Amino acid sequence: MSHKFRFSKESRERLKNFLLGDWYKTKGDAPAQETENPQPQAEAVSAAQGENAPAKAPGKSIAVVSRTDIGKMRKTNQDALIESTELRLYGVADGMGGHNGGETASAGARDGLLELLEGKEPEQGALRTAIGAVNRRLFLQQKGDEQLSGMGTTLTVLWLSDKCVYIGHVGDSRAYRLRDGELKQMTDDHSVVAELLRSGMLTPEQAATHPMRNVITRAVGTEDGIEIDLMCEERRAGDVWLVCSDGLYGMVGDEKIAEILKSYKPKKAADLLIAAALEGGGRDNISLVILLDKEGEQ
């Protein structure tokens, strides 16, 4: 995500006010992209890729597959996959920042979260505390190193207990759930364009090529404090979960993602999703984790 930017809350409000003015009104024919669902309570397949065999946790079975690809236009892969069958923790961090800042931030988020959650039972409080601590670490690290100035990362993770999927989310990576054939976006994008969409100031057609579409409004490590979205969703047998960076959903629409997840087992689906993102342009790093819940609540 080397071309992502992060806006402060104050800058975001100034931007909204600006866009409500006459300048924005002249842009009504700006082209197009995707909607965001409201949230309740391959050139080559994989330059680097990982895959876990079905993971057996106490009383619960989960099939897990992950993939990451540098894409067609980036020189480095600043995404990090988060996978621990022992913790039942899975997710994606999509880094940003010059020099090695993006890679440092995403790897730091991954490693810090795995360290801080080791031995913990899944619950929202522990997840909130761990993400907050990771944020503080990365913030202090970039403040102490000029070359890392401005670095940060998105972070979207699933942490599974026997009955619940706890979701922790900051930024514009996404968590989706496929249940009973219906794909649902479980997280809200923390981005300028997503906020404008939610407020009705942009149409989906205007959003796709909006000049601010790569500006995120929250990231891990960019400020001393952080606002984290936390959710708890009931596990159900047959659910398919997808966590991905914007390098996937920015190139592949939700309808196509749903079609692939419904039609193929996780391993094949992961390969096809990477291939579709590359075929769609591969403009960013592409990372994803797919979970098939075999033994959630019946």
PLM regions: where:
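PP2C/PPM-type serine/threonine phosphatase catalytic domain
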Residues: 1-298
